[in-house]
Structures are given as structure tokens and as C-alpha cells.
């Protein structure tokens, strides 16, 4: 009842020709990763030093509850890939052949029968690997620093949250917020020096 062009099409799991509660299946994944891991690397060569922290998680999913409707906005992905009618079709029943219509039509969240219950269309894999921290340093030669009256001078550059590899795309895969209402982790880059007298 109430189906319109551009709605999500559900699979008739039990094959009775009716889409109803009997077609629901259990989802064994949650928002909690099954695996968390990380690796710390520390190396030095002559006057150079290098430190890195790589972390990741796998086995979790995130259900996207977009704030579509009168009081919110779509994620860009949903807007760009939404179903659109063919402008040459007066009935508005055929999809636009020139548009990427891999998603459903634009919708009001509170009015759609297919958004009221969780479904796999809005479920996203949150597996990721992130370069959480990276630092490269250089200690000036002691012969140079002692002439300047300095015991040690180290120049360094470091960064945090520099790279993230994931297929999630909509928001930070570490976030547990389903609609993106949070401050994302900042990408930070520093240049500095440390002195010892």
C-alpha cells in the first residue's frame, strides 16, 4: 500500500508474494566492532626518528538515520544518487536514464512506510584503518648545537588523523551517531622544535 516510483524494493524472503513482517531476517552484526586493533611503529636512523600509530576496526555496521524531511537535510550521497523521474515521461513513472538513480527518491522520513523499520539499504559497513598519529623528527648534530649553547635541538613534524581508509564515506567510521550529529575528529598537523639547555 502506498508504494510510489522510487521507493525501496524489498525482497520477498519467504516467497509468498506479500512483503510483510514474515519477510524480516535477523541481522547478526551490530555497531560494536568484532575486531579492534592497532600497531605502533618506532624507528630511528642516525639523527632521524619516526613514530606512527595505525589503528582499525572491523565487523561493525552503522544504520543511517538521515535527518531527511522538514527539520533536516539529506546526506550528499542520498541527494546525488536519489531516484528521479524521466523528464520526458508525463506519468513520472520511469527513472531518468541520464541520472545515477541507485538510491530511493527524495523522501520525508516520518511519512515513509519503508523507513519506519530498519532495512539493509541504510546499513553501512564501518570497517576502517586509520593513520592515527605520525611524527618525524631530526636532531641537529651535537657539534652545531654546542656552539649555540644548546645541549640538544630537535625539529619535528607530526600529525593526527591524517588518513582513513574505509568504504563508509558518509561520516567518521568511529562515530556511533547514526545521523552525523557530532563534531568529527580533527585532522591536526604540527611543526615544532624542542630545546635542551
Predicted regions located by residue number:
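Repeated loop/turn-to-beta-strand initiation elements of outer-membrane beta-barrel proteins
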Residues: 47-52, 143-144
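Outer-membrane beta-barrel pore domains and translocons
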Residues: 44, 55-57, 158-162, 196
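Membrane-embedded beta-strand positions of outer-membrane beta-barrel proteins
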Residues: 52, 155-157, 193
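Membrane-embedded beta-strand positions in outer-membrane beta-barrel channels/transporters
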Residues: 38-40, 133-137, 190-192
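C-terminal beta-signal and terminal closure region of outer-membrane beta-barrel proteins
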Residues: 1, 96-103, 116, 162-197
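Acidic carboxylate motifs that coordinate Ca2+ or other divalent cations, activating on Asp/Glu
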Residues: 16, 20
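Extracytoplasmic gating/loop element in the C-terminal half of outer-membrane beta-barrel translocons
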Residues: 2-5, 57-149, 153-154
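Outer-envelope beta-barrel architecture signal
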Residues: 35-37, 46-48, 127, 149-153, ...
Amino acid at each position: 500500500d502506498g508504494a510510489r516510483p522510487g521507493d525501496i524494493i524489498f525482497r520477498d524472503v519467504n516467497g509468498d508474494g506479500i512483503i510483510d513482517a514474515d519477510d524480516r531476517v535477523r541481522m547478526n552484526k551490530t555497531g560494536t566492532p568484532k575486531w579492534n586493533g592497532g600497531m605502533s611503529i618506532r624507528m630511528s636512523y642516525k639523527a632521524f626518528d619516526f613514530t606512527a600509530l595505525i589503528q582499525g576496526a572491523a565487523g561493525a555496521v552503522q544504520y543511517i538515520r538521515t535527518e531527511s524531511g522538514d527539520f533536516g537535510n539529506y546526506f550528499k550521497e542520498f541527494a546525488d544518487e536519489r531516484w528521479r523521474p524521466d523528464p520526458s515521461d508525463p506519468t513520472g513513472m520511469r527513472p531518468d536514464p541520464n541520472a545515477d538513480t541507485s538510491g530511493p527518491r527524495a523522501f520525508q522520513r516520518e511519512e515513509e512506510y519503508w523507513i519506519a523499520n530498519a532495512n539493509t539499504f541504510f546499513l553501512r559497513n564501518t570497517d576502517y584503518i586509520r593513520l592515527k598519529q605520525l611524527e618525524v623528527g631530526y636532531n641537529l648534530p651535537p657539534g652545531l648545537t654546542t656552539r649555540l649553547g644548546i645541549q640538544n635541538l630537535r625539529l619535528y613534524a607530526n600529525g593526527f588523523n591524517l588518513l582513513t581508509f574505509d568504504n563508509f564515506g558518509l561520516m567518521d567510521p568511529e562515530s556511533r551517531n547514526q545521523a552525523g550529529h557530532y563534531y568529527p575528529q580533527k585532522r591536526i598537523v604540527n611543526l615544532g622544535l624542542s630545546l635542551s639547555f
